[in-house]
Curated annotation (Swiss-Prot):
Source organism superkingdom: Eukaryota
Signal peptide: 1-22
Protein name from the UniProt record: Coiled-coil domain-containing protein 134
Family to which the UniProt record says this protein belongs: Belongs to the CCDC134 family.
Organism encoding this protein: Xenopus tropicalis
Compartments, as annotated in UniProt: Endoplasmic reticulum lumen
Stretches of the chain forming a coiled coil according to its record: 192-218
An MF annotation (GO) of this entry: protein-macromolecule adaptor activity
Amino acid sequence: MDPVQLLSFLLALLLPLGTALDASKQKRDTAFEIYKKLFEVKRKDQINALNNLIELNDVNQQYKIIDIMLKGLFKVLEDSRAILIAAGVQPDGPFPEDEKIKDAYSHTVENSAFFGDVVLRFPKIVHHYFDRNSNWNNLIRWGIGFCNLSGIFDDGPHTQLLGLMSQELGISEKSPDYKNPFKMDNMEFLPNTDAFQKALREEEKRRRKEEKRKEIRKGPRITRSRSEL
């Protein structure tokens, strides 16, 4: 899968899977259980996409893709939080029936989990963006709290995800036995790889050029005086 196709696939994963439920005919607890099964399907797609990203074996491409992906992810998370708060949805309450609220619920749970996958597999790249963005920090803290109370992560293969990502991000204190389970699987973890440092320098250079171009475009314009008109 080439980088463009992979990026399109990753961005598509930021959208909810959908529940295909007739809520009026299902008990709310049944709707929640059905969603949990659909959540597992979405999680498999997310993991497969990240495995493809790892297999690119190109730090520059990974850097650019993750940059775009994280901006989209946190925009979705921010919009979803606004919807859920406005609707007064409690994460440990009944599973929502309204389609818009249901989508916001799915967005929150799925994208919070997906961000955990990304930070555990690409910690250095994610930290480079995340650590300087207080808005993202606040959003993911809220997302983790929502997920912890939702009950979706209480059992199954994702029970440790929220705790691991919280420790990796510095949201919670690292336990003495903390270990990133993916640390040996990805060369991105090497502390001073030439490839990563080169990608970092190139990205910073690109950002400075882009900021300079924006400043030039926003610069003062020459206007004619009334006497010249």
